[in-house]
Amino acid sequence: MEEFRRSYSRLCRESGAEPQEAVLQQLHQLPRGRLDLATQSLTVETCRALGKLLPRETLCTELVLSDCMLSEEGATLLLRGLCANTVLRFLDLKGNNLRAAGAEALGKLLQQNKSIQSLTLEWNSLGTWDDAFATFCGGLAANGALQRLDLRNNQISHKGAEELALALKGNTTLQQLDLRWNNVGLLGGRALMNCLPSNRTLWRLDLAGNNIPGDVLRAVEQAMGHSQDRLTTFQENQARTHVLSKEVQHLREEKSKQFLDLMETIDKQREEMAKSSRASAARVGQLQEALNERHSIINALKAKLQMTEAALALSEQKAQDLGELLATAEQEQLSLSQRQAKELKLEQQEAAERESKLLRDLSAANEKNLLLQNQVDELERKFRCQQEQLFQTRQEMTSMSAELKMRAIQAEERLDMEKRRCRQSLEDSESLRIKEVEHMTRHLEESEKAMQERVQRLEAARLSLEEELSRVKAAALSERGQAEEELIKAKSQARLEEQQRLAHLEDKLRLLAQARDEAQGACLQQKQVVAEAQTRVSQLGLQVEGLRRRLEELQQELSLKDQERVAEVSRVRVELQEQNGRLQAELAAQEALREKAAALERQLKVMASDHREALLDRESENASLREKLRLREAEIARIRDEEAQRASFLQNAVLAYVQASPVRTLSPPK
């Protein structure tokens, strides 16, 4: 910082002015990285020197120039020098009465500077000239580094707020914006509210003391809450990403360590393989010696083979002797076959007896099948009775649906009457509100003109006394306090008038509350009617559920009967097939018996096909009944949904009527 002091002194002397002792003292006591010139009256030469030094300064990250009473020229020179600075992060220009030229210089600063993150402009007059403030907003829209902006007490009107809203739509870095104690008004508040969905980074917006309705403030607070949630989520994601990146880096290090360990193990395995190859070479030598021994053993075996061939000749002679013995055995086998033929005849007689027994079993199975058929007919009669009961239930449901539709039509007619009456009352209240708003705007415009005239007079006095500013600074501060007291008195007078108008509006609110209570009574009556209809629908649903359970029980009984019959038929068929197989294996010559068995099988197939067709018919009838039952359930669900939808429509209409009351829009800001 010593170099900075020497450069400042040199530039001031080159311009023909002495350096300010207060500035030199602050530079001498300066902490590292922070230049605090607050409450120091900086001359134009000092501002020019600082504007030339700050672009090359690499240590100063914070610059405090609050209440320095900067002139337009001095502020322009200083801000022009900051355009090329790349290290400054915090800039405080509070209480310097910056106007048109200062606003334009700030706009250029925001366009060119890429390092300033916090900018404090409290107690200035940037919003007095719309064109200059539009230039400032253009610079804000193009800036990509600023995160915090303080614009309190800058006389920003609704037009300035609209320009600021356009800038916020293009800005992607600003996170905090303070607009307290300006003249934003209803139009400016709405413009700022409408720009918030386009801005994804702003999470704090202060609008207190701007004559903005409460509903707009609540909407802005809600949008800021969403932005804070997004910011929290983004920070959490960044933290998680950081943690995950650390984990990935740790895993990579572990993988590299594992790779090195793997390479070491591979080298060890290679050494072991070399050792094993040497051992295998020695083993091959041993195997070669063993192979030579085997060759000698094979030669010995060849000698044994010759001896075995001689023994084979002897065995052939023994085979001839065994052939003679075989001839005698064949004769014995012939006698045995004769005895087996006699036994076969006896088995054929037994098979005939078995066939007669099977025929008797088949007749018994036919009788049992007839009994099952009778049971199926009785179940069909019960099913027809259930179908008639279902038809009667359907008729009752149609009558109930017609009655519900009539009641719904009556409720809709009543709702239309209530809507017309509410619409008329809303139109009357809206016309009264418009008149009151016009009166209030005229009053505010007159007061604003008076204040502007007073400010212009004060500005003329300040310009005339600017040369003697160092001597009369205390007097200027006292006048500023008096102006603040007068402003507070004007605000208190406006607050009293607002309270009187609020009492008048509360009377109207009571009248509207009475109308709302009447509408709520009608809504409760409609809800009771809907509840009665729902209870009747639930009763019908219980009846349908009972019929469904009864139908399921009948289906279960029918399926059990079918399973028993199928099991019996399959058992009989299996027994017949087993008997048939044994008869075919034992009595190949008895063709007549085979034909009878085939006839029996054909009869069984015919019976099975008839039974299968009957089952298919029953299944189709059951499917049609299930489809009818499903349609009936869908009709009941649709009726329930219609009734619930109508009730929700009525409730939404009442809520919309209550929320559309003009009292909420005219309530004073908190």
From Swiss-Prot:
Pfam families: LRR_6. The modification Phosphoserine is found at S661. SUPFAM superfamilies: RNI-like. GO terms for cellular component: centrosome; ciliary basal body; cytosol; plasma membrane. Residues 252-645 form a coiled coil. The keyword Methyltransferase does not apply. It comes from the Eukaryota. Its main location: cytoplasm. LRR repeats lie at residues 58-80, 87-107, 115-136, 145-166, 173-194, 201-212. Phosphorylated by NEK2 during misosis, phosphorylation reduces centrosomal localization which subsequently leads to centrosome separation. Keywords: Coiled coil, Cytoplasm, Cytoskeleton, Leucine-rich repeat, Phosphoprotein, Repeat. Homomer. Interacts with CROCC/rootletin and CEP250. Interacts with CEP44. Interacts with CCDC102B (via N-terminus). Component of the proteinaceous fiber-like linker between two centrioles, required for centrosome cohesion. This is Leucine-rich repeat-containing protein 45.
